[in-house]
Regions:
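Active-site-proximal beta-alpha loop/turn segments in soluble metabolic enzymes
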Residues: 201-212, 245-258, 346
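Substrate-binding and catalytic surfaces of secreted/luminal carbohydrate-active proteins
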Residues: 48-58, 62, 74-80, 189-191, ...
């Protein structure tokens, strides 16, 4: 995760085209999320059929509450029209979620047993917001209370056989993943290291430095041992990236890895090691900002690395979300993923909601991403824990306020507007957009159509949703997010 970028910069990044639409009649039958009755399974598309509406307003007066239904009619409507076309099919969705950092686990475990179970159900169950994808760190991230890997040694020692490899320092994470899998056994997990063990690095430090070439094969075995150890705990690692933010060596922990080095590591060491161990965990390249699509393209253009690589992962602390589409268009047989974006303790709810829904949710999906992840799940009231030099302003989806409570932050609602209504294996379909209405649409495995709309206008916006020659006329409040299900 990036620490030092100015958050206001990101709001100015251009949104890669995206469309769809949304509505809202604020005649509220204001039902809380806990009153959800499987919103992805009801409705229809004939004249008189209802459109279910869920809304969050930037002023926080309404947060993920169901509103009065809109209704389809045979009339064409006038003014702005968002058209949804289910005949145009795009990528299948793996899921939406966050990174379950060690720090997140630490603070969630401070809740009472009952309150912790309530939170996990809220986040991961189908009656909650249904998070379907998690990222975890291999060893510590900068949002752990201490720096560690799974093979730390006294200074000057090495362990080429990895005889001292152990998950011991992550047992709390392992246990919470088991608790989460008990709620959603189908959740996908992406694992990423912030650094290799320092004895494998050319600077002997957790900050920066690079992997020594003589340890490439040992580090590949480190990944194999990790995946096998997690599998032994009943935790399947669906995918890995070789390095978090490989071009950001200033974080603690961190490690610098060029595109050439990553291609060499994958083609000559990691890929063959996975093959030899019969591991089918996906290898995803890059895992850094949208300003440098040349990095994943260099890895994918390597003819020996390419067969081992499932796709590329991106963050948006610099660049434009359209980078995902650029890479997809050049390698349409490879996947793209959006794996991290943080909200800041200095941000504001309205601005963060607007920028993140447009970019992280709508923008990434319209640019072929199979997932969309915000950063950490949870933090304490001081935006910790974090390592020395780690992020001091990262605001999680929830803030743990004590043993008895937690507060839901903007990142909770950013993800919830997708995760609650767009389950894994949904497929993106076509939608139009305009007049500061950003949209994306999906067809769920249950046959429902889901439309997510971000109204970036400061005032109310009336528009029409057109689907199968039927039209629903709706009005959406200024600076708000709506999800429509029909």
């Amino acid at each position: 995760m990036k620490l030092q970028y100015s958050y206001s910069f990101f709001r100015g990044a251009a949104l890669c085209g995206v469309a769809l639409l949304s509505f809202l009649n604020c005649s509220s039958t204001s039902s809380d999320l806990s009153n959800n009755d499987n919103p992805g399974n009801g409705g229809g598309t004939g004249t008189g059929d209802p459109v279910q509406v869920w809304l969050t307003k930037g002023d926080q007066s309404i947060k993920l509450q169901q509103q009065g239904n809109a209704v389809f009619s045979g009339a064409s409507g006038t003014g702005t029209t968002i058209e949804v076309d289910a005949s145009q099919l795009f990528q299948t969705v793996d899921g939406f979620g966050y990174t379950l950092t060690g720090g997140s686990v630490q603070v969630i475990n401070q809740l009472s047993t009952a309150k912790k179970q309530e939170l996990l159900n809220d986040l991961f169950s189908s009656s909650g917001i249904g998070i379907s994808y998690l990222r975890i760190s291999i060893g510590a991230s900068d949002l752990n209370s201490e720096v560690f890997t799974y093979n730390d040694l006294p200074s000057g020692q090495t362990d080429a056989n990895l005889s001292q490899f152990s998950l011991t320092k992550d047992q709390a994470v392992v246990q919470m993943l088991k608790d989460i899998l008990a709620i959603n056994p189908n959740i996908k997990i992406l694992a990423t290291p912030w650094t290799a063990p320092v004895w494998m690095k050319d600077n002997g430090n957790s900050i920066g430095g690079s992997l020594k070439p003589e340890y490439y094969s040992v580090y590949a075995k480190y990944f194999v041992k990790y995946i096998q150890a997690m599998q032994a705990e009943g935790i399947k690692i669906d995918a890995i990236t070789p390095q978090n933010e490989p071009l950001h060596p200033g974080n603690n922990p961190s490690m610098y890895m060029t595109a050439g080095d990553q291609a060499t590591f994958i083609k000559a060491h990691l890929g063959p090691a996975f093959q030899a161990a019969n591991i089918n965990t996906k290898i995803i390249a890059y895992d850094h900002n949208c300003d440098n699509p040349a990095y994943p393209l260099a890895v994918l253009n390597d003819p020996a690395a390419n067969p081992f690589v499932d796709g590329s992962a991106f963050h948006l602390y610099a660049g434009d979300i359209s980078a995902l589409g650029t890479v997809h268009n050049l390698f349409p047989n490879k996947n793209v993923y959006f794996t991290e974006q943080w909200t800041s303790s200095t941000g504001n709810f309205s601005g963060d909601l607007d920028w993140h829904v447009k970019n992280v949710i709508i923008g990434s999906m319209r640019n072929w991403s199979r997932n969309a992840l915000e950063w950490n799940v949870a933090n304490d009231a001081s935006f910790g824990p974090h390592t020395p030099g780690g992020c001091t302003q990262c605001k999680g989806a929830v803030t743990i306020t004590g043993a008895a409570g937690y507060d839901k932050n903007v990142a909770y609602y950013i993800i919830a507007h997708a995760s609650k209504f767009v389950p894994a294996n949904s497929q993106r379909i076509a939608s139009t957009q305009g007049d500061n209405l950003s949209t994306v649409a999906f067809k769920t495995p249950q046959g429902k159509t889901v439309l997510i709309v971000q109204n970036s206008n400061t005032g109310d916006k009336a528009f029409n949703i057109k689907y199968n020659q039927k039209t629903a006329s709706v009005t959406m409040p200024g600076v708000s997010t709506a999800t429509y299900i029909f």
